[in-house]
């Protein structure tokens, strides 16, 4: 019997080994989101040793974040081809090697290639597979699981920032990078526990063709994506798409992608600039580094609390609007705190920012999972991360350039806050429009775009189609179905009989 993933027709276990997977996802998320921000405590030393401006130095974090997001489609393809566990093990080695090599860098370009490209790629190859595996283990408790996993970011941020400051003071930035590279090897341990969820044997209707459980000679599996297709006839061979670009035609996905682009332009800027902003305001180095810890401490509480709140039956259908509210609150926090200069005002900003930032972090992937469904989530996540990469390459470096030119942080906070607030308003308005259009338009049979699985298989050649997702009441609109059912929709289960029928 293959171990590629859960058997069709069986829902996620919502527990068991899933809690171990959740713990690993917690660690990976912490490294992925906390590491690029924590590296900012080394910027002053890098600026001095390389005689560079802040904008040039900030490219290290920006490239790291861009690789984390921009290689999303690559990660999706690798997960579909090789599975979650091998990809995460390779990613952990790459992330560690990048920081170790960066400790020997003599030019900024070498830092860009090592700490930026290699470490960013390694983090990406850990982050996306961990989210995919988390979705395989949790369905009913998925909002809570997402919130708990997302709490890894503030926990690690609150720990890595002071740790980086201590390493910088004791060993210099080179010794600090070397030790942080060793710390990233924990990603390999996280990848090792990412085994596919167990499942029962195939459904009885598939046994009627004469194949016994686990003995089908044409069994094809996708280890990490949790997809398992069995050939019922050697003459018809279903093929799997390594990256499902058809998700781009989905209204819900388009709304989410635009929202994430606007959000990423400004969301990370305050956190990246915060330490140096405080230092320029006369705050001691240790106290300035502790500001990120304050953000992290508040974020730790906000993420699981918001995840549990979003899992309530009455609120879960309205998760997109909660996400919009979180974005709006984050943007308004930046706008109202642009003139903060005293340490007390900066602490108040960190508390408000950590609360809204935690809400965004807890809800962002839950909204995407609910919008596109589990079967298309790997491809959708990869494409969304690619969109975010473009915004990350624009936002923080542009902010750093403005700081160098204007010597003023105030306009940076105004710009960042406006972008994030605009993302929240757009998400709410566009979601409402999609829901209204879906209610007004008659529902048609089949999926949009029209081609059948067998036609796709013949056209793709070397790719194998993902399982068909039955047409729901419009993806984002399908969230409203939750209010009547009290639990999430499972479009992939509805589509399974069709897949079995077409393969005969």
UniProtKB/Swiss-Prot annotation:
<feature type="transmembrane region" description="Helical">
    <location>
        <begin position="144"/>
        <end position="164"/>
    </location>
</feature>
<feature type="transmembrane region" description="Helical">
    <location>
        <begin position="411"/>
        <end position="431"/>
    </location>
</feature>
<dbReference type="GO" id="GO:0005886">
    <property type="term" value="C:plasma membrane"/>
</dbReference>
<dbReference type="GO" id="GO:0008028">
    <property type="term" value="F:monocarboxylic acid transmembrane transporter activity"/>
</dbReference>
<feature type="compositionally biased region" description="Basic and acidic residues">
    <location>
        <begin position="204"/>
        <end position="214"/>
    </location>
</feature>
<feature type="topological domain" description="Extracellular">
    <location>
        <begin position="336"/>
        <end position="342"/>
    </location>
</feature>
<feature type="transmembrane region" description="Helical">
    <location>
        <begin position="116"/>
        <end position="136"/>
    </location>
</feature>
<dbReference type="GO" id="GO:0015293">
    <property type="term" value="F:symporter activity"/>
</dbReference>
<dbReference type="InterPro" id="IPR011701">
    <property type="entry name" value="MFS"/>
</dbReference>
<feature type="transmembrane region" description="Helical">
    <location>
        <begin position="255"/>
        <end position="275"/>
    </location>
</feature>
<protein>
    <recommendedName>
        <fullName>Monocarboxylate transporter 3</fullName>
    </recommendedName>
</protein>
<feature type="transmembrane region" description="Helical">
    <location>
        <begin position="290"/>
        <end position="310"/>
    </location>
</feature>
<feature type="topological domain" description="Cytoplasmic">
    <location>
        <begin position="311"/>
        <end position="318"/>
    </location>
</feature>
<feature type="topological domain" description="Cytoplasmic">
    <location>
        <begin position="194"/>
        <end position="254"/>
    </location>
</feature>
<keyword id="KW-0813">Transport</keyword>
<feature type="compositionally biased region" description="Basic and acidic residues">
    <location>
        <begin position="493"/>
        <end position="504"/>
    </location>
</feature>
<feature type="topological domain" description="Cytoplasmic">
    <location>
        <begin position="432"/>
        <end position="504"/>
    </location>
</feature>
<feature type="transmembrane region" description="Helical">
    <location>
        <begin position="86"/>
        <end position="106"/>
    </location>
</feature>
<dbReference type="Pfam" id="PF07690">
    <property type="entry name" value="MFS_1"/>
</dbReference>
<feature type="topological domain" description="Cytoplasmic">
    <location>
        <begin position="364"/>
        <end position="376"/>
    </location>
</feature>
<feature type="transmembrane region" description="Helical">
    <location>
        <begin position="15"/>
        <end position="35"/>
    </location>
</feature>
<feature type="transmembrane region" description="Helical">
    <location>
        <begin position="319"/>
        <end position="335"/>
    </location>
</feature>
<feature type="region of interest" description="Disordered">
    <location>
        <begin position="441"/>
        <end position="504"/>
    </location>
</feature>
<keyword id="KW-0812">Transmembrane</keyword>
<dbReference type="GO" id="GO:0016323">
    <property type="term" value="C:basolateral plasma membrane"/>
</dbReference>
<feature type="transmembrane region" description="Helical">
    <location>
        <begin position="343"/>
        <end position="363"/>
    </location>
</feature>
<feature type="region of interest" description="Basolateral sorting signal">
    <location>
        <begin position="485"/>
        <end position="504"/>
    </location>
</feature>
<dbReference type="InterPro" id="IPR050327">
    <property type="entry name" value="Proton-linked_MCT"/>
</dbReference>
<comment type="function">
    <text>Probable retinal pigment epithelium (RPE)-specific proton-coupled L-lactate transporter. May facilitate transport of lactate and H(+) out of the retina and could therefore play a role in pH and ion homeostasis of the outer retina.</text>
</comment>
<feature type="topological domain" description="Extracellular">
    <location>
        <begin position="36"/>
        <end position="58"/>
    </location>
</feature>
<feature type="topological domain" description="Cytoplasmic">
    <location>
        <begin position="80"/>
        <end position="85"/>
    </location>
</feature>
<feature type="topological domain" description="Extracellular">
    <location>
        <begin position="107"/>
        <end position="115"/>
    </location>
</feature>
<feature type="topological domain" description="Extracellular">
    <location>
        <begin position="165"/>
        <end position="172"/>
    </location>
</feature>
<dbReference type="GO" id="GO:0015727">
    <property type="term" value="P:lactate transport"/>
</dbReference>
<feature type="topological domain" description="Cytoplasmic">
    <location>
        <begin position="137"/>
        <end position="143"/>
    </location>
</feature>
<dbReference type="GO" id="GO:0016020">
    <property type="term" value="C:membrane"/>
</dbReference>
<feature type="region of interest" description="Disordered">
    <location>
        <begin position="196"/>
        <end position="224"/>
    </location>
</feature>
<dbReference type="InterPro" id="IPR020846">
    <property type="entry name" value="MFS_dom"/>
</dbReference>
<feature type="topological domain" description="Extracellular">
    <location>
        <begin position="276"/>
        <end position="289"/>
    </location>
</feature>
<keyword id="KW-0472">Membrane</keyword>
<dbReference type="GO" id="GO:0016324">
    <property type="term" value="C:apical plasma membrane"/>
</dbReference>
<dbReference type="InterPro" id="IPR036259">
    <property type="entry name" value="MFS_trans_sf"/>
</dbReference>
């Amino acid at each position: 019997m293959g171990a590629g993933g859960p058997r069709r027709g069986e829902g996620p276990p919502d527990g068991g080994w899933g809690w171990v997977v959740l713990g690993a996802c917690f660690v990976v998320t912490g490294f992925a989101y906390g590491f690029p921000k924590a590296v900012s405590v080394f910027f002053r030393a890098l600026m001095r040793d390389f005689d560079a401006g802040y904008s040039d130095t900030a490219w290290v974090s920006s490239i790291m974040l861009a690789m984390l997001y921009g290689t999303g489609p690559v990660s999706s393809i690798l997960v579909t081809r090789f599975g979650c566990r091998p990809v995460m093990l390779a990613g952990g080695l790459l992330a560690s090697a990048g920081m170790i090599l960066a400790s020997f860098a003599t030019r900024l370009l070498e830092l860009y290639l090592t700490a930026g490209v290699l470490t960013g790629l390694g983090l990406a190859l850990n982050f996306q597979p961990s989210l995919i595996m988390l979705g395989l283990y949790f369905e009913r408790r998925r909002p809570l699981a997402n919130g708990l996993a997302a709490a890894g970011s503030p926990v690690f941020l609150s720990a890595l920032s002071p740790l980086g400051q201590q390493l910088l003071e004791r060993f210099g930035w080179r010794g600090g990078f070397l030790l942080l590279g060793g710390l990233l090897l924990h990603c390999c341990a996280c990848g090792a526990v990412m085994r596919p969820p167990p499942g029962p044997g195939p459904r009885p209707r598939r046994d009627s063709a004469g194949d016994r459980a686990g003995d089908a000679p044409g069994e094809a599996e996708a280890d990490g994506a949790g997809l398992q297709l069995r050939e019922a006839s050697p003459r018809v061979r279903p093929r799997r798409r390594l990256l499902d670009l058809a998700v781009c035609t989905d209204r819900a996905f388009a709304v989410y992608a635009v929202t994430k682009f606007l959000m990423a332009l400004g969301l990370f800027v305050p956190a990246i600039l915060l330490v140096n902003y405080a230092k320029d305001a006369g705050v001691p180095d240790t106290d300035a580094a502790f500001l990120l810890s304050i953000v992290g401490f508040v974020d730790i509480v906000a993420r699981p609390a918001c995840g549990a709140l979003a899992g309530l039956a009455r609120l879960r259908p309205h998760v997109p609007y909660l996400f919009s509210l979180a974005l709006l609150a984050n943007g308004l926090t930046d706008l109202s705190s642009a003139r903060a200069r005293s340490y007390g005002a900066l602490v108040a900003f960190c508390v408000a920012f950590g609360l809204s930032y935690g809400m965004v972090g807890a809800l962002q992937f839950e909204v995407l999972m609910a919008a596109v469904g589990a079967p298309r989530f790997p491809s959708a996540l990869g494409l969304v991360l690619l969109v975010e990469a473009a915004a990350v390459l624009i936002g923080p470096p542009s902010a750093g350039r403005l700081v160098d030119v204007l010597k003023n942080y105030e306009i940076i906070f105004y710009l960042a806050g406006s972008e994030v607030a605009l993302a929240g308003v757009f998400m709410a308005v566009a979601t409402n429009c999609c829901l209204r259009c879906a209610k007004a338009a008659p529902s048609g049979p089949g999926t949009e775009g029209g081609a059948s699985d067998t036609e796709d298989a013949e056209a793709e050649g070397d790719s194998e189609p993902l399982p068909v997702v039955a047409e729901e009441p419009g993806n984002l609109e399908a969230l409203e179905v939750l209010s009547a059912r009290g639990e999430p929709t499972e479009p992939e289960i509805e589509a399974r009989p069709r897949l079995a029928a077409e393969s005969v």
